[in-house]
Curated annotation (Swiss-Prot):
Belongs to the purine/pyrimidine phosphoribosyltransferase family. XGPT subfamily. The keyword Zinc does not apply. It is a peripheral membrane protein. It catalyses: GMP + diphosphate = guanine + 5-phospho-alpha-D-ribose 1-diphosphate; XMP + diphosphate = xanthine + 5-phospho-alpha-D-ribose 1-diphosphate; IMP + diphosphate = hypoxanthine + 5-phospho-alpha-D-ribose 1-diphosphate. This is Xanthine-guanine phosphoribosyltransferase. Its cofactor is Mg(2+). Homotetramer. GO terms for biological process: GMP salvage; purine ribonucleoside salvage; XMP salvage. Purine salvage pathway enzyme that catalyzes the transfer of the ribosyl-5-phosphate group from 5-phospho-alpha-D-ribose 1-diphosphate (PRPP) to the N9 position of the 6-oxopurines guanine and xanthine to form the corresponding ribonucleotides GMP (guanosine 5'-monophosphate) and XMP (xanthosine 5'-monophosphate), with the release of PPi. To a lesser extent, also acts on hypoxanthine. Keywords: Cell inner membrane, Cell membrane, Glycosyltransferase, Magnesium, Membrane, Metal-binding, Purine salvage, Transferase.
Amino acid sequence: MSLPDKAFPVSWDQFHRDARALAWRLAGLDKEFRAIVCITRGGLVPAAIISRELNIRMIDTVCIATRHDYVNQGDTVLLKGVAPELTTDAGEGVLVVDDLTDTGKTALEVREMLPRAHFACVYAKPKGVPTIDTFVTEVSQDTWIYFPWDMGFTYQEPIAKGSRG
């Protein structure tokens, strides 16, 4: 598989720093979160970091599979919903966490379940920004983010193809 023209590889160190930066932003909101709902699978890692930083012990998952070919995003399939006790008060006091909002399709699906929850993600693309309350880094819509859990160590082509450094 060749990399898209705008590839944005993220290391474990960078992701950890960015997830902590998201936790700092959330802490600055002066909101009391009673639980985290992480959107799997991408939300698992930032939820672990944020739950530690904000001392939130109640964590649930909403499992949504997005069919994609690593270039285009497709339909979503709900595999597991949110625990009923977290949907009381329309999700007031619940923090929904994901790694990325791309088109916003997944966030909108979860927002139907938890309309009063606070939605946060580490990275956001322009189409997804309106669906998220708090994020750290915005990238262009045509950028493909490679998360550390999706990568191994391989040779990277230079940005300027054909240059002789």
